[in-house]
Amino acid sequence: MVIMTRLLLPFTHGIDVSAITRALALAHNLGATLVVLSLIRLPQRPDRGPRWEDIQQSNDFLEFVQHKAARSGVLVERVELYTHHPVGSIRALSQEMECAGIVLVVRRGTGVLLATHEVKQLLEDQRLSLYIVPLLAEASMFSLPRWLSHWFRGR
């Protein structure tokens, strides 16, 4: 019987190349499948839908991680959720998918891929198994045009 190890990488905003690269390296080193969870926040008002920019960023994130994972030989499972409560959804999905842990990326005490307050809420929950990935101070923000030009050249 093969035991599949899963690590959950949650995302709410701010595509960061170095964060994604480090999460993929962690999954590779542990022989784990990376469950890539993109959370799209729903507005509190029921007559409003999610922002188009949030949906587009979610799609970009999932595609970018899929591409990087394929190049590094890491298995990924993509999940996109629309939610009013991102942290609660992270907890629930981690348990539902039997993830060995949740990958949280930070830079200088600030959340990366998640808002800082979301990272803090997850850190406060002692029931969760967490993998904290610290990044160096310099930022490596995602540039869709640059990524697309590299991707098309590589095909």
Model-derived features with residue positions:
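Structural beta-alpha unit
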Residues: 1, 71-102, 107-110, 120, ...
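Small/aliphatic-rich secondary-structure junction motif
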Residues: 2-50, 72, 125, 135
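A conditional alpha-helix N-cap/helix-loop micro-motif detector
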Residues: 16, 58, 83-84, 112
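Aromatic/hydrophobic pocket-lining residues that form π-stacking "cages" and hydrophobic walls in ligand
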Residues: 23, 65, 90
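Conserved hydrophobic residues forming the short capping helix/wall of the S-adenosyl-L-methionine
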Residues: 27, 65-69, 94
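General small-molecule cofactor/ligand-binding pocket signal
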Residues: 35-37, 77-82, 131-133
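Acidic, proline/glycine-rich short linear motifs
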Residues: 38-61, 141-154
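Glycine-rich, Arg-bearing micro-motifs that act as flexible, cationic patches
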Residues: 103-126, 137-142
